[in-house]
Amino acid sequence: MSSKLTNITERFDFEGTICEIKPLGEGLINDTYKVKTAETDKPDYVLQRINHHIFPNIEMVMHNIDAVTSHIRNSLAANETPYIDRRVLRFLPTKNDGKLYTMMDDGTYWRLMIYIDNAITKQNIDPENSREAGRAIGNFQKMLADIPVALGETIKNFHNMEFRLEQLYDVVKQDPIGRVKEER
């Protein structure tokens, strides 16, 4: 177990005793690790290095994430939705300043969240997964329709649905790998 990763994790206000830290998933942007705790009544965690080359304004990224997750969590609670902790990420504050991220001496940024057991990431794209992803994006947009705070733009046009739809329509027109032709 890496003492560096343990030291980073210990900056956060978490419960339990760290017994293992190992890579998690196949992410392309951030480095992600599962932090396992020794106690069965304590959660496991996800430790993630935020790629500050992709997201140079870490403060804004974490403000957005906090605003979005808090709003969705509150909306689900108001509707008495079950299993909220399985539906919404929960980030932990640091011990020293209460921020939802920490910056290390080497200039890297890290965050810690509760691990959602048995969550899966689909690696293959098929029509059923695409429909489910579309439904999920639609539900996400619907849940944020009444968010009371402004979100900052961390990547130009990243959350601009009109721009994303135009990109989709352009790709459908171009059909670069022949999928549209196959479906007709």
Where on the chain are the PLM-derived regions?
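Conserved NTP-binding catalytic cores of kinases and kinase-like/nucleotidyltransferase enzymes
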Residues: M1-L100, M104-G107
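Broad hydrophobic/π-residue packing in well-ordered secondary structure
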Residues: R11-E15, Y33, T108-I116, H159-L165
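ATP-dependent phospho-/nucleotidyl transfer catalytic cores
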Residues: K22-E26, Q48-E59, I116-R131, R135, ...
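Short amphipathic C-terminal alpha-helix that caps PH/PH-like domains
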Residues: I65, A133-F140
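Protein kinase-like catalytic domain
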Residues: R73, Q141-P148
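Conserved structural core of kinase catalytic domains
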Residues: R90-E132
